[in-house]
């Protein structure tokens, strides 16, 4: 009796696998953070290598035509962002927004990557897109505040961080950003 060969993954297969990969990335990132806090550099490197491999696999899936491509680029972007490969991560998130221009989460991730590369004008643009598509989350507004502050647009930056604080008053990151902006403004 011949055993049938399974030669093609369905869209549902790709979707399920990519979501599993994304969830595993979050676990690995948490493990890497804990290992880093303990000073266990070999464990950090091991987790980062796994994260990179998952990113490469997700990018490979994204090269296969289908509805899953956007998710493949997104997971690949996350993996590269997690290991501070900012330019590659930004490229992946740009690919996501080319496919799905209203994907606010991809714009948010792109904002972060561009900021890490010191590309403040592009970071502002991505943050504005993120606030457009995810207007009721503090993260896009705080990222916009950071970009605007770096560009010397203090009044706009303060307005953006105040919006972030309105949306998420208990988020310590937003309060820290506001305090940092105020102290830097006082120094200048």
List the predicted regions and their residue ranges:
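Conserved structural position within tetratricopeptide repeats
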Residues: 63, 95-98, 128-132, 165-166
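Short coil turns that delineate tetratricopeptide repeat
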Residues: 66-67, 101, 135, 169
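Helix-start (N-cap) detector for alpha-helical repeat units in TPR-like alpha-solenoids
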Residues: 70, 104-105, 120, 138-139, ...
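Hydrophobic/aromatic packing residues within the alpha-helices of TPR/SEL1-like helical repeat arrays
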Residues: 55-58, 86, 93, 127, ...
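Register position in tetratricopeptide repeats
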Residues: 82, 116, 150, 183-184
């Amino acid at each position: 009796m011949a055993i049938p060969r399974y030669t093609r993954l369905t869209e549902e297969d790709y979707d399920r696998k990519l979501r599993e990969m994304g969830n595993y990335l979050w676990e690995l990132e948490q493990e890497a953070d804990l290992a880093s806090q303990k000073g266990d550099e070999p464990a950090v490197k091991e987790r980062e290598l796994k994260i990179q491999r998952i990113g490469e696999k997700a990018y490979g899936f994204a090269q296969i035509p289908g509805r899953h491509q956007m998710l493949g680029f997104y997971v690949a972007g996350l993996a590269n962002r997690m290991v501070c490969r900012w330019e590659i991560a930004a490229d992946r998130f740009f690919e996501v927004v080319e496919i799905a221009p209203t994907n606010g989460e991809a714009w948010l991730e792109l904002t972060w990557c561009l900021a890490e590369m010191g590309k403040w004008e592009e970071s502002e643009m991505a943050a504005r897109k993120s606030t457009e598509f995810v207007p009721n989350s503090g993260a896009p507004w705080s990222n916009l505040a950071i970009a605007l502050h770096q560009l010397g647009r203090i009044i706009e930056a303060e307005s953006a961080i105040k919006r972030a604080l309105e949306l998420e008053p208990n988020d310590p990151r937003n309060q820290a950003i506001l305090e940092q902006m105020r102290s830097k403004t006082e120094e200048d």
